[in-house]
């Protein structure tokens, strides 16, 4: 049993798995009102919404476009306590068919595979605050488009890139940022990636057999490929700030140590790289990364950023 939650839930992992199954697998959409607070704020890389109704509306729209969408839990990395609030970092793999009209355009009837990570603040049987990053670029590519083209379509429909400020998390919740161990090691590594890339020795950090799941549904195998990804991403930015917002490690018997880090990089699109030639526009990259450590080296990574949202910032008309 977990304090403040219904007696049926043995721990936070169990709670997240059960309510996900009920709402999205079981299509019990009205249960969102039961498990989300009325003032729950949800931030994605391209939007901020407040309230359970917005979650319901988004769920209905997604299911209209992808009626058979599954939400398969790959991992849930937990932090917090009953004294304040919990946070679940939930990595989801979704197979689905693009069978309905919506923001992704005319149905392509193609089978799509995409990942999402949702960081949810939970207390008293409800989700009260959430950060969610979905690999929209993977969806764009698999329906026959690409991230830049989809970004332009969304800009044409909306008139530009507008993102409201995310309300502060409830005062009783303090984000966990571990100061030692594997979570701290990985957070420091990310900071170095964005601030001093040339000083990094990948061999001190990554296992030789590192496998990374990258945005766009891509994969990197080995140190060279993953460092090329980092260079193309971080190397695009003339950095103004980099912040680790959450970092935690979960030790599991018989399994690699699992780490979740939510991070945010801001700067100017000042250099050639992942997003083409520099445009001088301001960029914000919200990322959530899951990592597995074995023998003090990273053996697996899952990086979630939204390349469509980043292209929207680049392509949005200047004022």
Regions found by a protein language model. Give the residues of each.
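C-terminal and inter-domain tail/linker signature
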Residues: 1-319
């Amino acid at each position: 049993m977990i304090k403040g939650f219904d007696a049926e839930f043995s721990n936070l992992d169990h709670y997240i798995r059960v309510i996900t199954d009920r709402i999205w697998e079981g299509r019990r959409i009205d249960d969102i009102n039961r498990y989300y607070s009325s003032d729950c704020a949800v931030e994605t890389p391209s939007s901020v919404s407040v309230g359970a109704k917005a979650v319901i509306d988004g769920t209905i729209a997604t299911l209209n476009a992808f009626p058979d969408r599954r939400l398969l839990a790959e991992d849930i990395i937990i932090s917090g306590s009953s004294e304040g609030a919990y946070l679940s970092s939930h990595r989801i793999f979704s197979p689905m068919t693009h069978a309905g009209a919506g923001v992704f355009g005319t149905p392509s009837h193609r089978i799509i595979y995409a990942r999402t990570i949702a960081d949810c603040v939970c207390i008293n049987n409800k989700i009260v605050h959430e950060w969610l990053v979905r690999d929209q670029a993977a969806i764009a590519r698999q329906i026959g488009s690409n991230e830049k083209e989809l970004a332009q379509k969304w800009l044409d429909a909306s008139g530009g890139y507008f993102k409201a400020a995310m309300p502060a998390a409830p005062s009783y919740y303090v984000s966990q940022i571990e100061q030692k161990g594997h979570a701290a090691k990985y957070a420091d590594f990310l900071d170095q990636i964005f601030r001093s890339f040339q000083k990094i020795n990948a061999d001190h950090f990554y296992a030789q057999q590192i496998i990374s799941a990258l945005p766009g549904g891509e994969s990197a195998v080995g140190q060279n490929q993953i460092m090329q990804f980092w260079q193309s991403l971080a190397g695009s930015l003339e950095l103004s700030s980099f912040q680790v917002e959450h970092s935690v490690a979960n030790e599991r018997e018989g399994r690699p140590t699992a780490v979740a880090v939510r991070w945010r990089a801001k700067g100017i699109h000042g250099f050639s790289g992942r997003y083409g030639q520099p445009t001088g526009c301001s960029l914000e990259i919200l990322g959530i990364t899951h990592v597995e450590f074995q023998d003090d080296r990273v053996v697996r990574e899952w990086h979630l950023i939204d390349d469509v949202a980043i292209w929207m910032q680049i392509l949005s008309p200047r004022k």
